[in-house]
Amino acid sequence: MFLLPRFCLVCSIIGTFGFENPPTNVVSHFNDDWFLFGDSRSDCNHVVNTNPRNYSYMDLNPALCDSGKISSKAGNSIFRSFHFTDFYNYTGEGQQIIFYEGVNFTPYHAFKCTSAGNNDIWMQNKGLFYTQVYKKMAVYRSLTLVNVPYVYNGSAQPTAFCKSGSLILNNPAYIAREANVGDYYYKSEADFSLSGCDEYIVPLCIFNGKFLSNTKYYDDSQYYFNKDTGVIYGLNSTETITTGFDFNCHYLVLPSGNYLAISNELLLTVPTKAICLNKRKVFTPVQVVDSRWNNARQSDNMTAVACQLPYCYFRNSTSNYVGIHDVNHGDAGFTSILSGLLYDSPCFSQQGVFRYDNVSTVWPLFPFGNCPTAASIISSDLPICVYDPLPIILLGILLGVAVIVIVVLLLYFMVDNGIRQHYA
């Protein structure tokens, strides 16, 4: 208890001199082992190809363009490349992973498989997809997209009926009905294989509703069977609705192996692309920056829904996106968020990134890294610091020893002085 006045005095001195070390609203990294996935707002190659060269197009600081730590493509996103013919092979590796993409598949694009479809289902798909990606990249270093080879023994070819605007679905592939089959009540199969990666994220999708064709209604049914382990993954249509439904996707995490895609009704689907996950690492939360349009266009919050603690930290600006190149490119708030990539930081938390690991006036929530020893402020002037008890105990012991030494020395000199006076 005798340490408490000194303890509070130290905290008061820190507060007096203004060393508050607050969390900052940025994405950053502990060291040089990081990687960013993005779109045009961090696509240095897109900027280089514009004439004249204009870095105001980006939210990323141009000093990072030659870092080799960025995989970005103007007009694209990982979700868009995963499902559609508009493809870019996002590839990167790092201990600390940052995502700043997703805006290129939003309600603004209004995608739905058919004219009677539902874009809300695709927003749900987007959220489920990024949930798996963020969770897995907290424990894997490497992400890339790979093709999935498959063998279908029939003569029918994949159909491109699931399309809207410039977007054409090609993952999963939708195998058309064989010419000699009269309706959609038939069983169809295709072999596919996964090899070369530690794990894969693959789509398993169905039309969850009554699909009408030639006055008959069909219930979709799709399965993937692992021929090596005997495990089966499946979805069956459960809804009775006949309009307003669309392609519901689940995103399975599968091991390498030989698989059989099976359809018992409607059309056969088989994955053609997968997220390839490699090199397991010590759990390190990913960081996600909100990816949205200027308010003149409709955006969604699916990356925020997917980014949940403890595997993900979400960063956002409090204001509308207003770019300086155009309204959708070069926003000051998001440029500020990405500026944290210019330097190392020791601690990530729910509130933000801490620049220093000694003390702070804010207690880090869901901290990760070497975080400051601090707690909340109970008054505007006096932070109450909570330290590791070991240094406090050692300090107490040292102070106690110092007091004993001082007392002994005082007694010694008092006795010695008395003896001298006696002999004098």
Swiss-Prot record:
Lineage of the species this protein comes from: Viruses, Riboviria, Orthornavirae, Pisuviricota, Pisoniviricetes
Keyword Membrane: yes
Virion surface compartment residues: 17-392
GO MF terms held by the record: host cell surface receptor binding; sialate 4-O-acetylesterase activity; sialate 9-O-acetylesterase activity; sialate O-acetylesterase activity
Active site residues per record: S40 (nucleophile), D326 (charge relay system), H329 (charge relay system)
Transmembrane intervals: 393-413
Known partners and oligomeric status: Homodimer; disulfide-linked. Forms a complex with the M protein in the pre-Golgi. Associates then with S-M complex to form a ternary complex S-M-HE.
Name this polypeptide is given: Hemagglutinin-esterase
Catalysed reactions, semicolon-separated: N-acetyl-9-O-acetylneuraminate + H2O = N-acetylneuraminate + acetate + H(+); N-acetyl-4-O-acetylneuraminate + H2O = N-acetylneuraminate + acetate + H(+)
Task performed by this protein: Structural protein that makes short spikes at the surface of the virus. Contains receptor binding and receptor-destroying activities. Mediates de-O-acetylation of N-acetyl-4-O-acetylneuraminic acid, which is probably the receptor determinant recognized by the virus on the surface of erythrocytes and susceptible cells. This receptor-destroying activity is important for virus release as it probably helps preventing self-aggregation and ensures the efficient spread of the progeny virus from cell to cell.
Species annotation: Porcine hemagglutinating encephalomyelitis virus (strain 67N) (HEV-67N)
Family: Belongs to the influenza type C/coronaviruses hemagglutinin-esterase family.
Keyword set includes Flavoprotein: no
Glycosylation sites: N54, N89, N153, N236, N301, N316, N358
